[in-house]
From Swiss-Prot:
Name of this chain's protein: Ankyrin repeat domain-containing protein 1
Residue windows of the ANK repeats: 152-181, 185-214, 218-247, 251-280, 284-315
GO cellular component: cytosol; fibrillar center; I band; nucleoplasm; nucleus; transcription regulator complex
Subcellular compartments: Nucleus
Function: May play an important role in endothelial cell activation. May act as a nuclear transcription factor that negatively regulates the expression of cardiac genes.
Primary gene name: ANKRD1
Domain of life: Eukaryota
InterPro entries to which the protein is assigned, alphabetical: Ankyrin_rpt, Ankyrin_rpt-contain_sf
Gene source species: Bos taurus
Quaternary state and interactors: Interacts with TTN/titin and YBX1.
Annotated PANTHER family: ANKYRIN REPEAT DOMAIN-CONTAINING PROTEIN 1, ANKYRIN REPEAT, PH AND SEC7 DOMAIN CONTAINING PROTEIN SECG-RELATED
Coiled coil regions in record: 61-89
SUPFAM superfamilies: Ankyrin repeat
GO molecular function term, any single one: transcription corepressor activity
Keyword Repeat in annotation: yes
Amino acid sequence: MMVLKVEELVTGKKKGNGDAGEFLPEDFRDGEYEAAVTLEKQEDLKTLPVHFVSLGEQQWKTEKQREAELKKKKLEQRSKLENLEDLEIIIQLKKRKKYKKTKVPVVKEPEPEIVTEPVDVPMFLKAALENKLPVIEKFLSDKNNPDVCDEYKRTALHRACLEGHLAIVEKLIEAGAQIEFRDMLESTAIHWASRGGSLDVLKLLLNKGAKISARDKLLSTPLHVAVRTGHYECAEHLIACEADLNAKDREGDTPLHDAVRLNRYKMIRLLITYGADLNVKNCAGKTPMDLVLHWQNGTKAIFDSLKENSYKASRIAAF
């Protein structure tokens, strides 16, 4: 087996017969190996034996050596990892560099819609549902009546309250829309807000003087509606604003009757916590307890727990 000396490996020269560099792989014949060794060992190759090269080869090797020196300088400029703080600094620098490279897409804000054509009543009512404020503004700026309604006497305010479009509700009220306007079922805006579940709209209506005790054709209050539709935050806000917990609708049902019948456990707990009457009877002579069916175990457990706690409290008070 032929043994090569270190000098032969590095310089590409072979002692004895044969051409220089003929034993090296093709990729290493043009000087890459020398540059790689320079970079890896971080030392100069001036101690290597000098061999004759042409002017072109000398320029090429000079360029390679210059590149190697630049790489060496870059390596020397890198932060040395002496402790965890150094590692953390490097990680932060990497993140910052990556962040700079990441191009943030520029999102253009949609241009405001400008309505120039006259707006008719169907377009106006549809815009209240679809939250198209420019259409609403155009209709109102043309001195039209904000309380125009459809065949069921539902106004734009009713529709906007149902969908929770706060800006449109504000604009309609500013234009003089009647908060207590009643539709065919005698529901007012506060009924529609409770049905839609928008707490912000509900708060706005109450701040503008909407009647919290308003009744529709079924004698339902806004609290009845919020409980039936399961809008907990609206129900809680109505209670906080002193809505009648034991108000009866046309069938004599209180909000608690409705909550029990619909298995709304959170509503049941909310109403009882704030003092709803467990023993009030509806027109059929039924209390909320009487409406609890055998399969409604969750509701029964709540009632049993509350009854037990109230019994213990009464015993303690007796002493």
